[in-house]
Amino acid sequence: MADKRKLQGEIDRCLKKVSEGVEQFEDIWQKLHNAANANQKEKYEADLKKEIKKLQRLRDQIKTWVASNEIKDKRQLIDNRKLIETQMERFKVVERETKTKAYSKEGLGLAQKVDPAQKEKEEVGQWLTNTIDTLNMQVDQFESEVESLSVQTRKKKGDKDKQDRIEGLKRHIEKHRYHVRMLETILRMLDNDSILVDAIRKIKDDVEYYVDSSQDPDFEENEFLYDDLDLEDIPQALVATSPPSHSHMEDEIFNQSSSTPTSTTSSSPIPPSPANCTTENSEDDKKRGRSTDSEVSQSPAKNGSKPVHSNQHPQSPAVPPTYPSGPPPAASALSTTPGNNGVPAPAAPPSALGPKASPAPSHNSGTPAPYAQAVAPPAPSGPSTTQPRPPSVQPSGGGGGGSGGGGSSSSSNSSAGGGAGKQNGATSYSSVVADSPAEVALSSSGGNNASSQALGPPSGPHNPPPSTSKEPSAAAPTGAGGVAPGSGNNSGGPSLLVPLPVNPPSSPTPSFSDAKAAGALLNGPPQFSTAPEIKAPEPLSSLKSMAERAAISSGIEDPVPTLHLTERDIILSSTSAPPASAQPPLQLSEVNIPLSLGVCPLGPVPLTKEQLYQQAMEEAAWHHMPHPSDSERIRQYLPRNPCPTPPYHHQMPPPHSDTVEFYQRLSTETLFFIFYYLEGTKAQYLAAKALKKQSWRFHTKYMMWFQRHEEPKTITDEFEQGTYIYFDYEKWGQRKKEGFTFEYRYLEDRDLQ
């Protein structure tokens, strides 16, 4: 009798739980259908799942009681079981809706009407992918076993069984990789619709047999497995796009790790099928082609030579450097130019251009570069004695002499080799004061030993030919190791055509030495005066001499960067011959010359406009340094403008409206509104005080108010855990949170007085 009463009590408790669970399920189900967004729906769906699991456990218990013979009246149990099953059906509907909500009805309809051929193709493709993954996993297992065995055989040499096992594993790895390559090729052909699904199905059994039984001792492989698929006729583009599944580098790692002499054969796997030969050969050819291309592209750098750009000197033939055997022809200009000079040159007028002669040998002690030389037509000779012409003012660097170094110079200049190179720039100014019209080369050199000399033809002192009063002369910026063209050649490097003034007959011809000219150029552009004599420049300082010697002995292979000049950069003014003996000086404009390597500038370098602007902006920014508070959000200031109200309205707030008792009579939502939207006011303080009196607690991490829904399940010194109700100020509503851990360090527990 007592057992029956006990059983009836259990049944009553179970049925009570069922009714409560069904009510809870109904409540959550209503919330789910009224949910506004997807996150809430997911949350309610999870709650539904929990409730339905509880009901399912109760249903199992009820089914047990229904099956037993101890209970006579089973109607109530059966009704409750059906009620639970009804809720289960409702949950299945909800679950189906949530799973298919991302797809439209049309999409679901199309999904049911899949093309059978497409479905078959997808199944075969999935089988190929799974088989490739299985083979790759087996390859990884083999490789790890080979590695461990290699370590053991290294410690114990002469273990023949382990070496045989290693060799067998390597053969398995080679065959597996061969099959992986073939299957990947078939998979790509299937994606490209270049192979039939039935053809793949024919080899499916053999491939599965290989995957399952390839390690059996009595396994016999079908060597003609892929012959029917005609993989030898694969387009090359299809093979080229194949991603490398495994590189041969792993084999080389095995070779290095294994000490057996026969392990070297694994670096190039030989598949049993001839279909692989095509793939292997094509891959080897591609590798060889890539290496050949890279070797060809790197060959100039390997040989240590620099490629010569053909568009820089299209007509300048290369001449080996030799010493001249005799004096150069009259009115010819021999000067040095860098090999990479790319400055455009204005062409000389036809009257000043003479026939091009073959390149004369020129002395060059620097690096060889293409040579270009121009020979101008000789001027008509006069009946009187020949007057020596002043050479173009040219410093010469390196231990060389002038162009007449073989004893053939007829001018009065003395060329000084070694210490007269221009050091503060890549190009020097050179100019000439002439007393009779002829072609004169204004040349410059950047530190090599090829000085230039212009020899004028013999002419009378008082009868200069008027037709040649203004002849173009060439000013070519030069560097180390090249020859610049003269005025009569427009095929070489750039040249500037400069009109020269004519000296009156009464002015004596000044003669310069190369050392004096170099000294003048180190101190700046040469200044020509109307005096008949020119003062000798000051001797070179020790700093300049040291810089000069350093530049000469540095042995720079690359030519000094050339100065890019245009007709607007250098303005040379000339005047016609005045009747008086005075001659106006030659005017030169300033140009910025880049420094050559190893040369110190003579004075501070002036800043450009852009650099000055940047400096001014930096200085201005220094006075307004950013502060960390600049990153904070700016709080807008809203002034309180009192609005004039009629006198019959209340002019003062109602009494006792600023007390805690007044705020306690307000609703909870009003208190939350005051707390969140009247920040920094007394009203916020009073609202917080009223909320605390209603047992709400403020969480300083989430900035939300929490209230216990029930007694916490766990209470420690650091936290308490249980079910809480919190006010979500973003969605403006109260939410329930189960199993929430409220850490006391985030509890705002100041006593509000």
Swiss-Prot record:
Compositionally skewed regions (Low complexity) per UniProt: 257-268, 350-376, 441-457
Positions carrying Phosphothreonine: T292
Tissue: Ubiquitous. Highly expressed in brain, heart, thymus, spleen, kidney, liver, small intestine, lung and peripheral blood leukocytes.
Keyword entries, A-Z: Cytoplasm, Developmental protein, Disease variant, Intellectual disability, Nucleus, Phosphoprotein, Repressor, RNA-mediated gene silencing, Transcription, Transcription regulation, Translation regulation
Span list, region Repressor domain: 661-753
Assembly with partners or alone: Component of the CCR4-NOT complex; distinct complexes seem to exist that differ in the participation of probably mutually exclusive catalytic subunits. In the complex interacts directly with CNOT2. Interacts with TIP120B and NANOS2. Interacts with EBF1. Interacts in an RNA-independent manner with BICC1 (via KH domains).
Record protein name field: CCR4-NOT transcription complex subunit 3
Gene name linked to the record: CNOT3
